[in-house]
Amino acid sequence: KPAPVEGKTVIGIIFQTDESRISAKEKALGYTHGLVMAIRSAHGTESPLTRYSFDTSFDTIPNKKTGVAWYGDIEGYQWTLNILEAYPGEKIQKCPAFDFTTTDFKPSAPSGTSGWYVPSIGQVWDMLSVFCGGEVAAHLKTLRTYGSDITYYYKYGGDLKLSYDPIAALNSV
């Protein structure tokens, strides 16, 4: 890890610099240097977990279930914009993950950036591949071309046996 720089505060960790894994929307807006995961999670004061949406008819973001679709979805920035448009003003409270991420999230993202947004499943995939160690990355690589329902794969027999704790690996970053 690089040494801290005096007078600077770390607000996030770069997890992706491959331009092919940055969305067309972000590229068009000039956000091409890389993707950053905030070092704080966006959640309420009562829980370290955040619900995606309380709206039972939520359909603003397409539901993707194959490994191909998961890996290919790098549209977190666009999905966040779609949610903000579909749930304007106080209605955003129906989607806590998006509300906490886009409403007064601290630390603020620097000016000239896309700002914070909820990552898509493909962007979470990239984070896990980078931060959870080589075995997780190797396993995820095998699923990039998995064309069946990946949730079924894990629910009914697909397993991942690791020689280490991936959450500990993620938390060590």
Question: Regions from the language model: what does each represent?
Answer:
Residues 37, 118-119:
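Short hydrophobic beta-strand that contains or immediately precedes a catalytic carboxylate
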Residues 1-113:
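Short, compositionally biased
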